[in-house]
């Protein structure tokens, strides 16, 4: 089956500009909040294939979206490596066994992805059955650098002094960690592809913390390794891959040279500028400021039309926000967004 989302990433003809939204299955939906209560806690929600399917399908059932994204968390990999992931209400993710010594990096185990992360591939199988070819399914991972920031800091951070200190003081150990994570991620994404995801995305949430040389050495190098390591053809279909470095507008050319099919943009770069810079090489995803969804429906329509009018051509653009949708957005405003994108981009 031909999907506009896949075709846009591969620069094939589309009937309209496809749209999906980062965190489209999430707390802004009342049905998600009900499922979250039923699960008891966030990790249980992630680790139950049936519940993960339920929340993945909620935005697909409610809105006319062009893709579903697997409901999971980027930190499932470090959890499987023995770091002990847990969540505190209002504080985000924490690790009970962070990488706070050089020896802890050396001794870090490489999990058997097929066994220890089987709940993720099981969820993909359940979701694919539920989707019944209505829309494609996106698999994903965090980038090695982004995973490393949480693993070394022990959770979220305001200034990231531990991980950046390790990078500057002991780059050999940092590279050892990133290389190990890259190998695991390749296995992880290939596992998702083998059970049915139609495309994959790498979220480099914290790549924008770095300067140009550090970004190339400690983030982009390893994402490029992953791009080269995953199955790009499977079961007769092409599996496109999208990279997203939040705060990465200055490195668009380098990201586009990684071999990826799509580059996701945050809202700090103009879409027409990005298209001039890299549009000949890759498809673009983005890039409405998530806070626009707090505005009136009329303003949402106006801002969406601005972005759509910036893009030149009939394919190669996937509409999205420049980051995840906020938890307190009115779901009706999400519906306005989706409907307006389709209305104004119909070929």
UniProtKB/Swiss-Prot annotation:
Site (Transition state stabilizer): 73
Domain of life the protein comes from: Bacteria
Enzyme type, top EC level: lyase
Protein localization: Cytoplasm
Alphabetized UniProt keyword annotations: Cytoplasm, Decarboxylase, Lyase, Porphyrin biosynthesis
One Pfam family recorded for the sequence: URO-D
GO biological process, one term: protoporphyrinogen IX biosynthetic process from glutamate
Molecular function GO labels: uroporphyrinogen decarboxylase activity
InterPro entries documented for this protein: UROD/MetE-like_sf (IPR038071), Uroporphyrinogen_deCO2ase_HemE (IPR006361), Uroporphyrinogen_deCOase (IPR000257)
Binding, substrate: 23-27, 73, 150, 205, 323
EC number(s) from the headed UniProt entry: 4.1.1.37
A cellular-component GO term for this protein: cytosol
Catalytic activity: uroporphyrinogen III + 4 H(+) = coproporphyrinogen III + 4 CO2
Entry similarity comment: Belongs to the uroporphyrinogen decarboxylase family.
Cross-referenced NCBIfam families: hemE
PANTHER family xrefs: METHYLTETRAHYDROFOLATE:HOMOCYSTEINE METHYLTRANSFERASE RELATED, UROPORPHYRINOGEN DECARBOXYLASE
Function: Catalyzes the decarboxylation of four acetate groups of uroporphyrinogen-III to yield coproporphyrinogen-III.
Listed name of the protein: Uroporphyrinogen decarboxylase
